From Swiss-Prot:
Purpose of the protein: Positively regulates lysosome peripheral distribution and ruffled border formation in osteoclasts. Involved in bone resorption.
GO molecular function per UniProt: zinc ion binding
Keywords: Acetylation, Metal-binding, Phosphoprotein, Repeat, Zinc, Zinc-finger
GO biological process: lysosome localization; positive regulation of bone resorption; positive regulation of ruffle assembly
Source species, domain of life: Eukaryota
Zinc in keyword set: yes
Chain ranges passing through the membrane: none
Protein name: Differentially expressed in FDCP 8 homolog
Species of the source: Homo sapiens (Human)
Similarity annotation: Belongs to the DEF8 family.
UniProt-annotated stretches for the region Disordered: 77-116
Chain intervals with Acidic residues compositional bias: 95-105
Subunit details: Interacts (via C-terminus) with PLEKHM1; this interaction is weak but increased in a RAB7A-dependent manner.
Modified residues (Phosphoserine): S501
Length: 512
């Protein structure tokens, strides 16, 4: 209770009145208004009658209560995240209206300090929100937004031209939206150690003894004391603290949707075209005068800083197809990962890129002949039950394009040709396939041919080295017999005569 004296209150008595009211009334902090009220109370009252002094003291107390009520409604708890509004001054006896968060704070009188407790608390990281929404409400809102974005992306894909770059980008965007939606629907999946960032799918590594280098900060990853992740798509390795600093998307998406090589040998454009900055992280680089050394990538021809170019060595596809040069050259980290993912993809059509290569590299001619024979053997295996049960075609599962065409090559194929490995392995597979067709399987033997020109010799097959195949009817002949008869096919002549007889023979309606 406030102690009111009948005498003129001195400074200490006024201070006691203010302190009692402060203790009896909880508030959030001391502001300029409260300090002003305290200063007014501490001012000695003039002399006069006891009744007059009592009325003045009561009036001051009522005025203080009104100001304190307005102060409470004008300020929020400083531990809330959002700073509260302040109301306009109201006269005595007026009803205080509700204050909405949209109302602005009034300006304080000159000379009074600003009240900034909420901001200071937020800066210190001490703010709390005890009235936040449940996690499920945020999840439902995000799921609804993702579903709406997926539907809009579908509509955009249907409206864009077929096989256009914008349509491909929209398809990639749709895939990422679906993955994000699936992650939100299954937040408690069995793989909590996977993080998706910029098309990277990082998996938390469990190895503690293998020493690796972070691809972001270019420092050693100490597995015993540091957490690190590896991208399952491009094998990008980094510390857990460096995940949010990654700015380059995963190159596996580029391999999936734009699988092609740069076939110009070191297409340099100069540092001025890069604005004297790293082609990947945009850090300032130069050939001299700056701490970061400019390093050129032999694949892209661009310049990189020492953090993005570690002087890694790789075989350049353009030098292979044009010069048959397999010497490793220095490339950037991004090009290194891209070439590593592309090494087994058959995207090189050598006959169109460099047709003279088959004239100078004999191994390529042998490989092409073996691939053509395997394509001729494929129909036998598809229609043979024993071959399908034995899964003979799986002998080429590492090079699936060998059973699809004889024109496409991968960089790994050319590396194996240069090393002499591909010719030996392909010859063994060719021998195994021919043995099944000509010796082991009676059904495949029954599908052989007899030379209709000489009608002598063994059963012929289209993949035999001494045979020729008619381009029109696929009949097989001895090579010498076929060219001695001026490449005329008796089967084609017989089929043409049969067609003519069918057209010339009159029907029963014509004779009647």
């Amino acid at each position: 209770m406030a102690i009111l004296s009948l005498r003129a209150p001195g400074p200490w008595q006024a201070m006691q009145v203010w302190a009692d009211r402060t203790l009896l009334t909880p508030h959030t902090g001391v502001t300029s208004q409260v300090l002003g009220v305290a200063a007014a109370v501490m001012t000695p009252l003039p002399g006069g009658h006891a009744a007059g002094r009592t009325r003045e003291a009561r009036w001051d107390a009522m005025e203080y209560d009104e100001k304190l009520a307005r102060f409470r409604q004008a300020h929020l708890n400083p531990f809330n995240k959002q700073s509260g509004p302040r109301q306009h001054e109201q006269g005595p006896g007026e009803e205080v209206p509700d204050v909405t968060p949209e109302e602005a704070l009034p300006e304080l009188p000159p000379g009074e300090p600003e009240f900034r407790c909420p901001e200071r608390v937020m800066d210190l990281g001490l703010s709390e929100d005890h009235f936040s929404r449940p996690v499920g409400l945020f999840l439902a809102s995000d799921v609804q937004q993702l579903r709406q974005a997926i539907e809009e992306c579908k509509q955009v894909i249907l409206e864009l031209p077929e096989q256009s770059e914008k349509q491909k980008d929209a398809v990639v965007r749709l895939i990422h939206l679906r993955l994000k939606l699936q992650e939100l629907k299954d937040p408690n999946e069995d793989e909590p150690n996977i993080r998706v960032l910029l098309e990277h799918r990082f998996y938390k590594e469990k190895s503690k003894s293998v020493k690796q280098t972070c691809d972001k900060c270019n420092t050693i990853i100490w597995g015993l004391i540091q957490t690190w992740y590896t991208c399952t798509g491009c094998y990008y390795r980094c510390h857990s603290k460096c995940l949010n600093l990654i700015s380059k998307p995963c190159v596996s998406s580029k391999v999936s949707h734009q699988a092609e090589y740069e076939l110009n040998i070191c297409p340099e454009t100069g540092l001025d075209s890069q604005d004297y900055r790293c082609a990947e992280c945009r850090a300032p680089i130069s050939l001299r005068g700056v701490p970061s050394e400019a390093r050129q990538c032999d694949y892209t021809g661009q310049y990189y800083c020492s953090h993005c170019h570690w002087n890694d060595l790789a075989v350049i596809p353009a030098r292979v197809v044009h010069n048959w040069d397999f010497e490793p050259r220095k490339v950037s980290r991004c090009s290194m990962r891209y070439l590593a993912l592309m090494v087994s993809r058959p995207v090189l059509r050598l006959r169109e890129i460099n047709p003279l290569l088959f004239s100078y590299v004999e191994e390529l001619v042998e490989i092409r002949k073996l691939r053509q024979d395997i394509l001729l053997m494929k129909p036998y295996f598809i229609t043979c039950r024993e071959a399908m049960e034995a899964r003979l075609l799986l002998q080429l599962q590492d090079r699936q394009h060998f059973v699809e065409n004889d024109e496409m090559y991968s960089v790994q194929d050319l590396l194996d040709v240069h090393a002499g490995r591909l010719g030996c392995s392909l010859t063994e597979i060719h021998t195994l396939f021919a043995k099944h067709i000509k010796l082991d399987c009676e059904r495949c033997q029954a599908k052989g041919f007899v030379c209709e020109l000489c009608r002598e010799g063994d059963v012929l097959f289209p993949f035999d080295s001494h045979t020729s195949v008619c381009a029109d009817c696929s009949a097989v002949f001895h090579r010498d017999c076929y060219y001695d008869n001026s490449t005329t096919c008796p089967k084609c002549a017989r089929l043409s005569l049969r067609k003519q007889s069918l057209f010339q023979e009159p029907g029963p309606d014509v004779e009647a």
